[in-house]
Protein backbone atom coordinates (compact mmCIF):
# COMPACT_ATOMS: atom_id res chain seq x y z
CA UNK A 1 0.00 0.00 0.00
CA UNK A 2 1.23 3.47 -0.89
CA UNK A 3 2.53 5.65 1.94
CA UNK A 4 1.51 8.83 0.11
CA UNK A 5 -0.69 11.10 2.26
CA UNK A 6 -2.94 11.47 -0.80
CA UNK A 7 -3.58 7.75 -1.24
CA UNK A 8 -7.16 6.68 -0.61
CA UNK A 9 -8.01 2.97 -0.87
CA UNK A 10 -10.64 2.00 -3.41
CA UNK A 11 -14.09 1.92 -1.87
CA UNK A 12 -15.87 -1.46 -2.13
CA UNK A 13 -18.85 0.27 -3.75
CA UNK A 14 -16.77 1.99 -6.46
CA UNK A 15 -17.39 1.05 -10.08
CA UNK A 16 -14.72 -1.28 -11.47
CA UNK A 17 -13.89 -0.59 -15.14
CA UNK A 18 -12.74 -4.19 -15.51
CA UNK A 19 -16.30 -5.27 -14.71
CA UNK A 20 -18.08 -2.78 -16.95
CA UNK A 21 -21.33 -4.00 -18.50
CA UNK A 22 -19.84 -3.02 -21.82
CA UNK A 23 -21.03 -1.14 -24.87
CA UNK A 24 -24.09 -1.60 -27.02
CA UNK A 25 -21.89 -2.33 -30.03
CA UNK A 26 -18.96 -4.61 -29.06
CA UNK A 27 -15.47 -3.18 -29.53
CA UNK A 28 -11.95 -4.34 -28.75
CA UNK A 29 -10.68 -2.89 -25.48
CA UNK A 30 -7.87 -0.35 -25.41
CA UNK A 31 -4.44 -1.42 -24.16
CA UNK A 32 -3.74 2.02 -22.70
CA UNK A 33 -7.04 3.31 -21.30
CA UNK A 34 -9.86 1.97 -19.16
CA UNK A 35 -13.34 1.86 -20.73
CA UNK A 36 -14.36 4.90 -18.69
CA UNK A 37 -11.27 6.86 -19.75
CA UNK A 38 -12.10 6.07 -23.39
CA UNK A 39 -15.60 7.42 -22.82
CA UNK A 40 -14.12 10.63 -21.44
CA UNK A 41 -11.89 11.05 -24.46
CA UNK A 42 -14.76 10.38 -26.87
CA UNK A 43 -16.86 13.09 -25.25
CA UNK A 44 -14.01 15.61 -25.32
CA UNK A 45 -13.48 15.06 -29.05
CA UNK A 46 -17.11 15.61 -30.05
CA UNK A 47 -18.24 18.68 -31.93
CA UNK A 48 -21.07 19.02 -29.38
CA UNK A 49 -18.52 19.39 -26.57
CA UNK A 50 -16.48 21.95 -28.50
CA UNK A 51 -19.57 24.03 -29.19
CA UNK A 52 -20.12 24.45 -25.44
CA UNK A 53 -17.45 27.15 -25.52
CA UNK A 54 -20.01 29.55 -26.99
CA UNK A 55 -23.11 28.39 -25.14
CA UNK A 56 -23.90 30.40 -22.06
CA UNK A 57 -25.03 29.60 -18.54
CA UNK A 58 -26.83 32.84 -17.65
CA UNK A 59 -25.35 35.62 -19.77
CA UNK A 60 -25.61 35.65 -23.56
CA UNK A 61 -22.18 35.38 -25.17
CA UNK A 62 -22.04 38.96 -26.42
CA UNK A 63 -22.60 40.33 -22.89
CA UNK A 64 -18.93 39.86 -22.00
CA UNK A 65 -15.94 37.54 -22.29
CA UNK A 66 -15.29 36.99 -18.58
CA UNK A 67 -18.48 35.10 -17.80
CA UNK A 68 -18.70 31.35 -17.70
CA UNK A 69 -19.92 29.30 -20.63
CA UNK A 70 -21.21 25.74 -20.72
CA UNK A 71 -17.68 24.61 -21.57
CA UNK A 72 -15.93 26.34 -18.69
CA UNK A 73 -18.72 25.19 -16.38
CA UNK A 74 -18.33 21.58 -17.57
CA UNK A 75 -14.58 21.71 -17.00
CA UNK A 76 -15.09 23.10 -13.49
CA UNK A 77 -17.67 20.41 -12.70
CA UNK A 78 -15.29 17.75 -14.00
CA UNK A 79 -12.46 19.06 -11.81
CA UNK A 80 -14.61 18.99 -8.68
CA UNK A 81 -16.03 15.57 -9.59
CA UNK A 82 -12.62 14.03 -10.19
CA UNK A 83 -11.17 15.41 -6.95
CA UNK A 84 -14.19 14.36 -4.90
CA UNK A 85 -14.29 10.88 -6.44
CA UNK A 86 -10.60 10.39 -5.75
CA UNK A 87 -11.01 11.48 -2.13
CA UNK A 88 -13.92 9.04 -1.67
CA UNK A 89 -12.08 6.10 -3.25
CA UNK A 90 -14.35 6.01 -6.30
CA UNK A 91 -13.50 5.69 -10.00
CA UNK A 92 -12.40 9.21 -10.89
CA UNK A 93 -12.45 8.56 -14.65
CA UNK A 94 -16.14 7.66 -14.58
CA UNK A 95 -17.09 10.62 -12.38
CA UNK A 96 -15.12 12.99 -14.61
CA UNK A 97 -16.64 11.53 -17.78
CA UNK A 98 -20.22 11.97 -16.59
CA UNK A 99 -19.41 15.51 -15.45
CA UNK A 100 -17.92 16.44 -18.82
CA UNK A 101 -20.89 15.05 -20.71
CA UNK A 102 -23.76 16.20 -18.53
CA UNK A 103 -24.44 19.48 -20.37
CA UNK A 104 -23.75 18.73 -24.05
CA UNK A 105 -27.46 18.60 -24.86
CA UNK A 106 -28.09 22.19 -23.76
CA UNK A 107 -29.34 24.53 -26.51
CA UNK A 108 -28.04 28.08 -27.03
CA UNK A 109 -28.92 30.87 -24.59
CA UNK A 110 -28.98 28.79 -21.41
CA UNK A 111 -32.28 28.07 -19.70
CA UNK A 112 -34.06 30.64 -21.88
CA UNK A 113 -33.18 28.54 -24.91
CA UNK A 114 -34.45 25.37 -23.28
CA UNK A 115 -37.70 27.06 -22.26
CA UNK A 116 -38.30 28.28 -25.81
CA UNK A 117 -37.54 24.94 -27.47
CA UNK A 118 -39.86 23.26 -24.99
CA UNK A 119 -42.58 25.72 -26.01
CA UNK A 120 -41.89 25.22 -29.73
CA UNK A 121 -41.91 21.43 -29.35
CA UNK A 122 -44.94 21.20 -27.04
CA UNK A 123 -47.11 19.72 -29.80
CA UNK A 124 -44.31 17.51 -31.14
CA UNK A 125 -43.00 15.59 -28.13
CA UNK A 126 -41.38 18.33 -26.09
CA UNK A 127 -37.74 19.13 -25.35
CA UNK A 128 -35.58 18.27 -22.33
CA UNK A 129 -31.85 18.99 -22.20
CA UNK A 130 -31.10 15.76 -20.30
CA UNK A 131 -32.81 13.71 -23.00
CA UNK A 132 -31.05 15.76 -25.68
CA UNK A 133 -27.70 15.00 -24.05
CA UNK A 134 -28.55 11.30 -24.19
CA UNK A 135 -29.56 11.59 -27.85
CA UNK A 136 -26.34 13.42 -28.69
CA UNK A 137 -24.17 10.61 -27.31
CA UNK A 138 -26.32 7.74 -28.62
CA UNK A 139 -27.52 9.09 -31.96
CA UNK A 140 -26.75 12.61 -33.13
CA UNK A 141 -22.94 12.62 -33.00
CA UNK A 142 -21.77 10.80 -36.11
CA UNK A 143 -18.05 10.11 -35.91
CA UNK A 144 -17.70 6.37 -36.37
CA UNK A 145 -18.31 4.16 -39.43
CA UNK A 146 -20.10 1.31 -37.65
CA UNK A 147 -22.58 3.11 -35.40
CA UNK A 148 -24.22 6.46 -34.68
CA UNK A 149 -23.41 8.16 -31.40
CA UNK A 150 -20.34 7.46 -29.28
CA UNK A 151 -21.07 3.88 -28.16
CA UNK A 152 -20.32 4.77 -24.54
CA UNK A 153 -20.25 2.21 -21.75
CA UNK A 154 -23.40 1.26 -19.89
CA UNK A 155 -22.10 2.96 -16.74
CA UNK A 156 -21.52 6.29 -18.48
CA UNK A 157 -24.92 6.25 -20.18
CA UNK A 158 -26.58 5.37 -16.88
CA UNK A 159 -24.79 8.24 -15.19
CA UNK A 160 -25.69 10.77 -17.86
CA UNK A 161 -29.41 10.04 -17.64
CA UNK A 162 -29.70 9.18 -13.92
CA UNK A 163 -27.09 11.32 -12.15
CA UNK A 164 -29.85 13.27 -10.39
CA UNK A 165 -31.66 10.12 -9.28
CA UNK A 166 -34.23 7.59 -10.57
CA UNK A 167 -36.22 8.86 -13.54
CA UNK A 168 -39.21 6.52 -13.72
CA UNK A 169 -41.66 9.36 -13.02
CA UNK A 170 -40.39 11.17 -16.12
CA UNK A 171 -40.85 8.27 -18.53
CA UNK A 172 -44.47 9.17 -19.19
CA UNK A 173 -43.48 12.57 -20.54
CA UNK A 174 -43.45 12.80 -24.36
CA UNK A 175 -39.98 14.40 -24.23
CA UNK A 176 -38.62 11.23 -22.61
CA UNK A 177 -39.81 8.89 -25.37
CA UNK A 178 -36.26 8.44 -26.68
CA UNK A 179 -35.10 7.22 -23.26
CA UNK A 180 -37.97 4.75 -22.94
CA UNK A 181 -37.26 3.38 -26.41
CA UNK A 182 -33.54 2.96 -25.69
CA UNK A 183 -34.20 1.41 -22.29
CA UNK A 184 -36.49 -1.20 -23.86
CA UNK A 185 -33.49 -2.60 -25.76
CA UNK A 186 -30.63 -1.79 -23.40
CA UNK A 187 -31.85 -1.81 -19.81
CA UNK A 188 -30.52 1.14 -17.81
CA UNK A 189 -32.34 0.43 -14.55
CA UNK A 190 -34.20 3.73 -14.66
CA UNK A 191 -36.04 3.02 -11.39
CA UNK A 192 -32.85 2.86 -9.30
CA UNK A 193 -30.15 5.29 -8.25
CA UNK A 194 -27.07 5.62 -10.43
CA UNK A 195 -23.53 4.76 -9.37
CA UNK A 196 -21.79 6.70 -6.62
CA UNK A 197 -19.61 8.22 -9.35
CA UNK A 198 -22.67 9.60 -11.14
CA UNK A 199 -23.98 10.99 -7.87
CA UNK A 200 -20.61 12.69 -7.33
CA UNK A 201 -20.95 14.33 -10.76
CA UNK A 202 -24.40 15.64 -9.80
CA UNK A 203 -23.14 17.16 -6.54
CA UNK A 204 -20.10 18.59 -8.33
CA UNK A 205 -22.52 20.35 -10.68
CA UNK A 206 -24.31 21.90 -7.69
CA UNK A 207 -21.01 22.96 -6.13
CA UNK A 208 -19.68 24.51 -9.33
CA UNK A 209 -22.71 26.45 -10.48
CA UNK A 210 -23.68 27.86 -7.08
CA UNK A 211 -20.19 29.15 -6.38
CA UNK A 212 -19.48 30.39 -9.84
CA UNK A 213 -22.83 32.11 -10.22
CA UNK A 214 -21.92 34.06 -7.08
CA UNK A 215 -18.63 34.96 -8.74
CA UNK A 216 -20.22 35.92 -12.07
CA UNK A 217 -23.08 37.80 -10.42
CA UNK A 218 -20.72 40.09 -8.52
CA UNK A 219 -18.53 40.47 -11.61
CA UNK A 220 -21.58 41.54 -13.64
CA UNK A 221 -22.67 44.07 -11.02
CA UNK A 222 -25.99 42.32 -10.34
CA UNK A 223 -25.26 42.36 -6.60
CA UNK A 224 -22.40 43.33 -4.30
CA UNK A 225 -20.30 41.57 -1.70
CA UNK A 226 -22.06 43.59 1.00
CA UNK A 227 -25.41 42.22 -0.16
CA UNK A 228 -24.07 38.67 0.27
CA UNK A 229 -23.24 39.20 3.94
CA UNK A 230 -26.69 38.09 5.13
CA UNK A 231 -26.86 35.04 2.83
CA UNK A 232 -26.20 31.68 4.56
CA UNK A 233 -22.87 29.96 3.89
CA UNK A 234 -21.30 32.67 1.75
CA UNK A 235 -22.02 35.42 4.31
CA UNK A 236 -20.02 33.92 7.22
CA UNK A 237 -17.20 32.91 4.87
CA UNK A 238 -17.04 36.39 3.40
CA UNK A 239 -16.99 37.89 6.90
CA UNK A 240 -14.08 35.63 7.84
CA UNK A 241 -12.10 36.59 4.73
CA UNK A 242 -12.62 40.29 5.43
CA UNK A 243 -11.59 39.86 9.05
CA UNK A 244 -8.50 37.77 8.33
CA UNK A 245 -7.37 39.60 5.18
CA UNK A 246 -8.46 43.24 5.30
CA UNK A 247 -5.62 44.00 2.89
CA UNK A 248 -7.35 42.27 -0.04
CA UNK A 249 -9.13 44.29 -2.72
CA UNK A 250 -12.72 43.47 -3.71
CA UNK A 251 -11.73 41.08 -6.48
CA UNK A 252 -9.38 38.99 -4.35
CA UNK A 253 -11.84 39.06 -1.46
CA UNK A 254 -14.53 37.65 -3.75
CA UNK A 255 -12.28 34.97 -5.20
CA UNK A 256 -11.00 33.89 -1.78
CA UNK A 257 -14.56 33.63 -0.43
CA UNK A 258 -15.64 31.52 -3.41
CA UNK A 259 -12.59 29.28 -3.03
CA UNK A 260 -13.37 28.68 0.64
CA UNK A 261 -17.04 28.03 -0.10
CA UNK A 262 -16.12 25.36 -2.65
CA UNK A 263 -13.87 23.74 -0.04
CA UNK A 264 -16.60 23.84 2.59
CA UNK A 265 -19.10 22.21 0.25
CA UNK A 266 -16.67 19.50 -0.83
CA UNK A 267 -15.80 18.72 2.80
CA UNK A 268 -19.50 18.54 3.65
CA UNK A 269 -20.23 16.06 0.84
CA UNK A 270 -17.30 13.88 1.89
CA UNK A 271 -18.40 13.78 5.52
CA UNK A 272 -22.07 13.10 4.75
CA UNK A 273 -21.27 10.44 2.14
CA UNK A 274 -18.89 8.53 4.40
CA UNK A 275 -21.48 8.69 7.19
CA UNK A 276 -24.15 7.27 4.88
CA UNK A 277 -21.83 4.57 3.59
CA UNK A 278 -21.13 3.44 7.15
CA UNK A 279 -24.81 3.57 8.14
CA UNK A 280 -26.03 1.58 5.12
CA UNK A 281 -23.12 -0.85 4.95
CA UNK A 282 -22.92 -0.69 1.15
CA UNK A 283 -20.37 -3.15 -0.19
CA UNK A 284 -20.84 -2.94 -3.96
CA UNK A 285 -21.94 -0.65 -6.75
CA UNK A 286 -25.21 -2.58 -6.91
CA UNK A 287 -25.80 -1.88 -3.23
CA UNK A 288 -25.56 1.83 -4.04
CA UNK A 289 -28.13 1.50 -6.82
CA UNK A 290 -30.56 -0.40 -4.62
CA UNK A 291 -30.64 2.11 -1.77
CA UNK A 292 -33.88 4.04 -1.26
CA UNK A 293 -31.95 7.32 -1.09
CA UNK A 294 -28.81 8.90 -2.47
CA UNK A 295 -25.47 7.78 -1.06
CA UNK A 296 -23.59 10.93 -2.11
CA UNK A 297 -25.24 13.98 -0.60
CA UNK A 298 -24.98 17.24 1.28
CA UNK A 299 -25.77 17.27 4.98
CA UNK A 300 -29.19 18.59 5.97
CA UNK A 301 -27.68 21.84 7.24
CA UNK A 302 -25.71 22.41 4.04
CA UNK A 303 -28.74 21.59 1.89
CA UNK A 304 -30.77 24.18 3.78
CA UNK A 305 -28.09 26.84 3.38
CA UNK A 306 -27.81 26.07 -0.34
CA UNK A 307 -31.57 26.39 -0.80
CA UNK A 308 -31.42 29.91 0.65
CA UNK A 309 -28.40 30.78 -1.51
CA UNK A 310 -30.26 29.56 -4.61
CA UNK A 311 -33.25 31.69 -3.67
CA UNK A 312 -30.99 34.74 -3.43
CA UNK A 313 -29.45 33.95 -6.82
CA UNK A 314 -32.86 33.34 -8.39
CA UNK A 315 -34.16 36.71 -7.23
CA UNK A 316 -31.04 38.82 -7.71
CA UNK A 317 -29.44 37.16 -10.73
CA UNK A 318 -31.53 34.73 -12.78
CA UNK A 319 -34.51 37.14 -12.81
CA UNK A 320 -32.56 40.39 -12.86
CA UNK A 321 -33.97 42.80 -15.43
CA UNK A 322 -30.73 42.74 -17.43
CA UNK A 323 -30.89 38.94 -17.64
CA UNK A 324 -34.63 39.04 -18.40
CA UNK A 325 -33.96 41.36 -21.31
CA UNK A 326 -31.49 38.97 -22.92
CA UNK A 327 -33.82 36.04 -22.18
CA UNK A 328 -36.60 37.75 -24.11
CA UNK A 329 -34.33 38.46 -27.07
CA UNK A 330 -32.98 34.91 -27.05
CA UNK A 331 -36.42 33.32 -27.00
CA UNK A 332 -37.56 35.47 -29.91
CA UNK A 333 -34.54 34.43 -31.98
CA UNK A 334 -35.19 30.72 -31.46
CA UNK A 335 -38.96 30.96 -31.89
CA UNK A 336 -38.69 32.78 -35.21
CA UNK A 337 -36.07 30.39 -36.59
CA UNK A 338 -38.05 27.35 -35.48
CA UNK A 339 -41.20 28.62 -37.19
CA UNK A 340 -39.41 29.38 -40.45
CA UNK A 341 -37.48 26.10 -40.59
CA UNK A 342 -40.60 24.05 -39.87
CA UNK A 343 -42.66 25.88 -42.50
CA UNK A 344 -39.86 25.98 -45.10
CA UNK A 345 -37.42 23.10 -44.43
CA UNK A 346 -35.68 23.76 -47.75
CA UNK A 347 -33.92 26.74 -46.14
CA UNK A 348 -32.17 24.36 -43.74
CA UNK A 349 -28.55 23.45 -44.53
CA UNK A 350 -28.39 20.52 -46.97
CA UNK A 351 -27.56 17.87 -44.37
CA UNK A 352 -30.43 18.89 -42.13
CA UNK A 353 -32.85 19.29 -45.02
CA UNK A 354 -32.04 15.71 -46.05
CA UNK A 355 -32.74 14.51 -42.52
CA UNK A 356 -36.13 16.25 -42.57
CA UNK A 357 -37.33 14.46 -45.68
CA UNK A 358 -39.89 11.62 -45.62
CA UNK A 359 -41.03 12.52 -42.11
CA UNK A 360 -44.34 13.65 -40.71
CA UNK A 361 -44.64 17.10 -39.14
CA UNK A 362 -43.53 15.86 -35.71
CA UNK A 363 -40.47 14.23 -37.26
CA UNK A 364 -39.57 17.40 -39.15
CA UNK A 365 -40.03 19.42 -35.99
CA UNK A 366 -37.58 17.13 -34.17
CA UNK A 367 -34.97 17.63 -36.90
CA UNK A 368 -35.43 21.40 -36.71
CA UNK A 369 -35.15 21.23 -32.92
CA UNK A 370 -31.95 19.17 -33.15
CA UNK A 371 -30.43 21.68 -35.56
CA UNK A 372 -31.27 24.66 -33.35
CA UNK A 373 -30.25 22.88 -30.12
CA UNK A 374 -26.79 22.31 -31.56
CA UNK A 375 -26.20 25.99 -32.31
CA UNK A 376 -23.94 28.22 -30.26
CA UNK A 377 -25.23 31.58 -29.05
CA UNK A 378 -23.22 33.49 -31.63
CA UNK A 379 -24.21 31.18 -34.48
CA UNK A 380 -27.89 31.45 -33.56
CA UNK A 381 -27.70 35.25 -33.53
CA UNK A 382 -25.93 35.30 -36.90
CA UNK A 383 -28.24 32.70 -38.46
CA UNK A 384 -31.27 34.68 -37.34
CA UNK A 385 -29.77 37.86 -38.80
CA UNK A 386 -29.21 36.18 -42.17
CA UNK A 387 -32.74 34.80 -42.23
CA UNK A 388 -34.70 37.83 -41.08
CA UNK A 389 -32.68 41.00 -41.75
CA UNK A 390 -32.70 42.19 -45.35
CA UNK A 391 -29.65 44.40 -44.81
CA UNK A 392 -27.40 41.32 -45.01
CA UNK A 393 -27.95 41.50 -48.78
CA UNK A 394 -26.31 44.91 -49.00
Swiss-Prot record:
SMART domains: HDc. Gene3D superfamilies: Hypothetical protein af1432. Residues 16-34 have a biased composition (Basic and acidic residues). Residues 70-210 form the HD domain. Residues 1-34 are annotated as: Disordered. It comes from the Bacteria. PROSITE patterns: HD. It holds the Pfam family HD. SUPFAM superfamilies: HD-domain/PDEase-like (SSF109604). GO terms for biological process: dGTP catabolic process. The keyword Hydrolase applies. GO terms for molecular function: dGTPase activity. Keywords: Hydrolase. InterPro entries: dGTPase, dGTPase-like, dNTPase_2, HD/PDEase_dom, HD_domain, HDIG_dom, PHydrolase_assoc_dom. Belongs to the dGTPase family. Type 2 subfamily. PANTHER family: DEOXYGUANOSINETRIPHOSPHATE TRIPHOSPHOHYDROLASE-LIKE PROTEIN, DEOXYNUCLEOSIDE TRIPHOSPHATE TRIPHOSPHOHYDROLASE. This is Deoxyguanosinetriphosphate triphosphohydrolase-like protein.
Amino acid sequence: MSSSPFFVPRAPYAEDPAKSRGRRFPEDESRTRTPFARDRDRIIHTSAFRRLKEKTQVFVAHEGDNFRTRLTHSLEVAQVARSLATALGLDSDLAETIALGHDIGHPPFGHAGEDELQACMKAFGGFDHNVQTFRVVTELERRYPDFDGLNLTWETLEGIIKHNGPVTEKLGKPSWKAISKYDAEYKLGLNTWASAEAQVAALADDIAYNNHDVDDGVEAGLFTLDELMDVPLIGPILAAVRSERPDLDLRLTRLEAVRRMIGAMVDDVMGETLKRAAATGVQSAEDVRNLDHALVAFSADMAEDLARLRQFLHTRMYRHWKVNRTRSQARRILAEMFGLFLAEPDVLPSEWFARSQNRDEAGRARVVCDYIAGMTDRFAIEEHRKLFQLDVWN
